[in-house]
Amino acid sequence: MRDLLSKKSHRQLELLELLFENKRWFHISELAELLHCTERSVKDDLSHVRSSFPDLIFHSSTNGIRIINTDDSDIEMVYHHFFKHSTHFSILEFIFFNEGCDADSICKEFYISSSSLYRIIRHINKIIKKQYCFEISLNPVRITGNEIDIRYFFAQYFSEKYYFLEWPFEDFSQEPLSQLLEFVYKATSFPMNLSTHRMLKLLLVTNLYRIKFGHFMEVEKNSFNNQLLESFMQAEGIDEIVASFDSEYHISLNKEVIGQLFVSYFQKMFFIDEEVFLNHAKTDSYVKKSYQLLGDLVDQVSREYNLQVDNRDNLIWHLHNTAHLHRQELSTEFILFDQKGNTIKNFQNIFPRFVSEVKEGMEHYLEALDMDPSSMKVNHLTYTFITHSKHLVLNLLQNQSKLKVLVMSNFDQYHAKSVAETLSYYCSNNFELEVWGELELSLDALKESPYDIIISNFIIPPIENKRLIYSNNVNTVALISLLNAMMFIRLDE
């Protein structure tokens, strides 16, 4: 979807991502090579992003250029900027909110000619069709196609373009939606939290706009849980919610509308309750296969990495639901900001082999169930595995061998012991700190020693497979921070 940006904006976004992700100096020539453009273009882009993002701190020197993160700046604001200043995305948003308007009103809103509008729409449709099954038409102005794709795309768009606390939906205030969702949580005992609550509000308000313009999803009778819908419509307190929707939104919250709002959660392969899922895993052949495949993966990973997965069935339940909510919950695919992909990448930097094996397992699971094993779907399932496995990170860290650290001083043994004791207190328990106890010291002795990290206040020549820290260069606080960071850099990987 980044191709909906202009070529210049696309390149500037990639430039900022490079500078944010890599905390180092870049020469202009290197950036030009990475971005496949001229050095002149890089210089122009740097000038533009500096003026566009005054809160970002750029450092320039003979070493090149780098960006310095501050406490109140984050790459998230970069994506908001490019969404906001993109004509293509702005036109898409305008059409979503104003479906049924005439093409002239779009031209007047964006100060463009009719021919320019038609050219832009052709380009938008060309890009969208590469990934989604819907298109924009201008006679009349409508968004038509696969309703799941339409609803997902725009809900994801709103989640990426607007900040967490923003609510850009003038036609639908938040309160009735929140009341409906709180009613659902109570009626179904569905586990809820802040981020999931916001996600559901965005999905529901997107659905409301589509319903407002007369677009309903086709639901296969065999895949829809009518029994759950019926019990929901008869739950105590539903009449007050219906009245609220009627007075605030002028929408009749009947059975059909409720079904359209929560269509993803009334499908038979989604289970609101964990116990219901586990019971179906005993009687339904498809659910049983899904449970067994995921269970085999969890058990395999647990054995290989010596993990104690206390919430095995709960994890399998979440993974099954995640697999069957593709494009029906946010961040299963991204438009500009691959936030979950970045989260997985950060985790993979620490545990590369573990993440790779989980990804392979998820790909096998999807293929075995005849589901599309796209990289985005695999990533989303991997994210769910990592975040929903109880104490996973703690167990992986505890199971890693401790790094052996040698502390030496040319002052005396007491200084070395003092440094070692300080580091032992403030650093994690993933280190074994010792001081040199022999009378003689040689480079060969250090090479043959079992230590992974050597800290000294005197210079030692580089040693292969040893990390050397010259303590005169850093204060104690920086030394603690540096050593803690090193536990994530395994010497054998």
Predicted regions and their residues:
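A cross-family "folded-core" feature that marks the main globular domain of proteins
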Residues: M1-E493
